[in-house]
Amino acid sequence: MYFNIQRFSTHDGDGIRTILFLKGCSLSCPWCQNPESRSAKHSLLFDERSCMADCQLCVSAYKQTVNGDMASDGIRRIDDQIIINRKAMSEAQIIALRNVCPTQALSICGEAAKSDDLFEVLMKDKPFYDQSQGGVTFSGGEPLMQPSLVAELAERLHQNHVSTAVESCMHVPWKNVEKSRRILIAG
């Protein structure tokens, strides 16, 4: 699962880089730059400033996911505010809200990480990597929580002469580090 691909970055390794932000982190650092990345699952984001509470499309869509059960309190309107109880919502209910909000005050963070699709996107910037001695940086969240994906992508990138870097706190099981060891050394 990933939540962003940032192209043309110059701050996360040598040269021009593309950063793949992966979801999932076992820490809860108060200074985290990407708190939306903590959950390895889809996350519901809400920007109250963009919300037109009168529209209530999110409330209606949520009610459909619970078959109109008024006791369920995942999303409800109280006075002129939308109240969200993320703990009361399943991942399927969160995904069902993906394109409901016309102002995008309510959005979903997280996309399924399909290796072939990600590789194709990451390779789009190959001319920039070649010119600047850049490459791809795996970040997050904690990228080593998805060691198979990171190892597979890094292997394919290396085969295409693209350097890789990993931003990690290393707070993962040692087997995850072992699985990614070759890419950590090869860079």
Predicted regions and their residues:
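Non-cysteine beta-strand/loop elements that form the S-adenosyl-L-methionine
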Residues: 183-187
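Conserved Radical SAM active-site core
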Residues: 38-181
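N-terminal cysteine/histidine-rich coordination modules
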Residues: 1-38, 43
